[in-house]
Amino acid sequence: MSSQNHIKGQGAQRNVKNRFEQYSYEPEDWEIEKTNTQIIEVFPKTIVNVVKSPDLPMEYSLNPYQGCEHGCSYCYARPTHEYWGFSAGIDFERKIMVKKNAPELLEKFFIKRNYIPKTIMLSGNTDCYQPIERELEITRKILEVCLAYRHPVSILSKNALVLRDLDLFIKMNELNLISVALSIPTMNEDLRRKMEPRTSSAIKKLEALKILKENNIPTGAMIAPIIPGLNSDETLKIIKKISETGADWFGYTLIRLNDTVEPVFVKWLETSFPDRKDKVISLIKQMRGGKLGEKRYFERYKGEGSIAEMIHKTIEIGRNKYFRDRKMVELSAAHFSGSKTQQLKLF
C-alpha cells in the first residue's frame, strides 16, 4: 500500500492477526477499503474495574465502550479487542461494543454495603466521549448517577463533546466531584487527521478547556503520546497553549507499541509518513532499550536513554515556565450517599 493509498478517517490501515487465533486472513492492499462502524450491544455483569497498576493514580476505572471510533493509530488499548475475538486493527475502531446497562450497574456498585467511595476514572481504556456517545449518551447517564450519589469522577478524553455535559459538571463541582482533562498530542492538524482521525482538533480541545475553566471546572491536559520524530518538537508549544486555557495541570507519556499495537502503528507510518518511518522507528527503539514496546511498571511511561531524557528535560522546562504554581485539584468523596443509605434507586 503506497502513501497515496492511505485510508482517510482510519488510524489502522488494515486488520492484524489476533494473537489468540491460530488462523487469520490478511487481505491484499487492493482489497482494503474504508469500513463503516458497527455498533454491538454487550451486557456485562459488572462495570467498575479495580485498577491495580502501581504506576497509575487511580483505583477505579469505568469504560462504557469497548473499542474506539477515534481511531488513534498508537492506542495502547487496541490489543484488548482481541479478547473479544476481533482484530486490534480496523476492528478496534469500527466494531464498537456498547454497554447501555452501565448506569444501572454503576448504581448497584454504589449501594454495596461495604463499598468505600474513591474517584472513578472515565475511561482508562477507550474514550467515553467517542463519536457514538453523542447519540447514545451512556457517559452522560453515568454522570447523572454519580451526581445523584455524590460520587467523584475524573474524565480524560480526546473529544470536545465533553462540553455537552457542562451543566452536570457545574452541579458536580459544587461538591468537588469532577475534573476534566483532554489529551492534546499535536497542534499540527495534518498530523492529527492522520494519527487520530476522528478526535477533535487541538483548537476545539483548547477552547473546551478554556470554557470549562471559565465555569470553574478543574481541568488538565495530557500530551500523549509523545512520539520522537513526529510530535516531540511541539512539546513546549503545546504546554504553552494548555497553560493559556487556565488548566490546573498537564501530564505526558512516551509512546510504547506493545503487542499488536506495533504492526498497526508501523503500517500506519508506512502509509502516512513513508519518508519518516525508519527514523521514527529507530528513535522509539532508542528510548525503549532496542524494542518498540514496554510493559514494565513505571518504565512504560518514562522510557530510557538520551532521547527520553531530552524529552523529560523539555517537559520540565515547560512545567517550570508555564505551570510553576499550579497543581491538580483533589476531588472529594465526603458527600457520598450510596452504601450508607441505599435510598435512591434510579433504575
What is each model feature region?
Residues 1-43, 211, 233-347:
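Auxiliary Fe-S-binding modules of radical SAM enzymes
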Residues 27-66, 73-181, 185-193, 201-214:
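Conserved Radical SAM active-site core
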Residues 174-177, 218, 244-248:
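Glycine-enriched alpha-helix->loop->beta-strand junction motifs that scaffold or abut catalytic
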Residues 187-189, 195-198, 211-231, 254-257, ...:
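Conserved strand-turn element in the central/C-terminal portion of the radical SAM core barrel
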Residues 68-70, 225:
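Basic (Lys/Arg-enriched) interaction patch that binds polyanionic ligands
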Residues 153, 219, 250:
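Hydrophobic anchor at the start of a short beta-strand
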Residues 160-163, 227-236:
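Active-site glycine- and acidic-residue-rich loops that bind
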